[in-house]
Amino acid sequence: MLDESLIDAAVSRILALKFRLGLFEDPRLPDQERIDAVIGSDEHQRLNLELTRESVALLKNNGSLPFAADDAKRIAVVGPLADDAQTQLGDWAGNSGQVNWMPDGHPRHMITTVLDAFKQLVPAGCNVVYSRGANIVDLVPDPEGEFYPDGQPRPKIGVSAAVDQAMIDEAIENARQSDLVVAVVGDVVQLIGEGCSTGTLELLGGQNALLEALSNVARETGKPLVVVLMSSKPMVLPASVIGTNGVIVDESAAEGTSALLWAPSPGMKGGQAIAEIILGITEPSGRLPITFPRHAGQLPVYYNQIRGQHGNRYADLTQDPAFAFGEGLGYTTFEYGEPAITNVPDSGAFTESDTVHAEITLTNTGERKGIEVVQAYIGDIVTSYSWTDRELKSFKRVELEPGESKTVAFDIPVADCTIVDPDANRIVEPGEFELLVGHSSRREDLKRTVFTVA
């Protein structure tokens, strides 16, 4: 048993701190007037829209995007997350999947879902229809009991929902009658919030069945199917989106999916940013800060693994991820020149106190203005201790008009080109380093040059 004096001493320290902060005179209770004026204000919404426009990543496009809606008569917006305001915000944002005592959530009128946005942005005369298509989770009582030991009620937990064929049939009917199908799928807060981990990375509930059915319709009709993935973690997508896995991937199963966008917790105006990108109002420029595996068995699959951690493939599966760190497409094409280091010392070698200045020419070879995120990676070619093959050191966002070229420059301190020794010290080892510049972390997307450190 604790002595009561110990509790008194602890309480005394807390009260003394509150006194020093002036909380007894001014408890600083929430200012409702300020809350109403600031939270979800026009400036907040403008900033959220700007950030989301730049963060949504276009991962696949067979040429169907941007979609020209001027001649479209009907667009089908499908999926359990197409009109889900809470999933756009994420966990602990106005509400939570972890407790049942939160308020009613973020005011709905402040949130623009994907369905809302298409209704607002399509031309007059184009009808937007919605079908849910699938459920993700069913909420059931916690098997641990209705209450926590302290008497607080336990929230219900989410379990994977069963496939609902009637919902899929409704979505198929809408898809057949539409010029464009936008399917919004992913995770809900019960699966990604605090204290929540799933035993699989696959889409749960009836989502895979829905995507397969929509993909079949798209192949039969030739109408574009755009999949929007809302998730805050990498997910394993079905064959209808990324093809059939194997040592050699069979892409034929994914021919029905025209395009794929990833939107991680896009926020209040997320639906507007997504619709703008699909309709070509906004140029996609987001790049992946994570890597998407093809199968959970590939993990770990992040780009900067220690050399020798994996072979080049499994016996039954490629080691290449579905989508790699740094990947993301736009609506134009770019051509990279060869990287050049322009400040090599007369000795031919840099010292640890030097900075490497590198330049590369980037050209917009397409017909639209576009944004490219030029990425610079460093690799220490021979190391005394096992270390990663390459690491991102810098990146630049470059906007170019059609036919325009620009020299993109990077200044990388040699002191940043470190490895970690067995004593956990970061050190720069003398020797040859490679500078890799390009579109993503994939080797085939990078241009290479080398420099020496003495």
Short names for language-model regions:
Residues 1-115, 119-159, 230-371, 377-379, ...:
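Secreted, periplasmic, or luminal enzymes acting at the cell surface/secretory milieu
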Residues 86-89, 185-205:
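Glycine/threonine-rich flexible loop motifs
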Residues 178:
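An anion/phosphate-binding loop that grips the pyrophosphate of nucleotide cofactors and donors
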Residues 384-420:
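Intrinsically disordered, low-complexity Pro/Gly/Ser/Thr-rich segments with frequent PxxP/GP/PP motifs
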Residues 416-432:
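Short glycine/proline/serine/threonine-rich loop/turn segments at secondary-structure transition edges
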Residues 369-376, 388, 420-422:
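Short, hydrophobic/aromatic beta-strand segments
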Residues 171-174, 253:
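Structural alpha-helical scaffold elements that stabilize or flank donor/cofactor-binding regions
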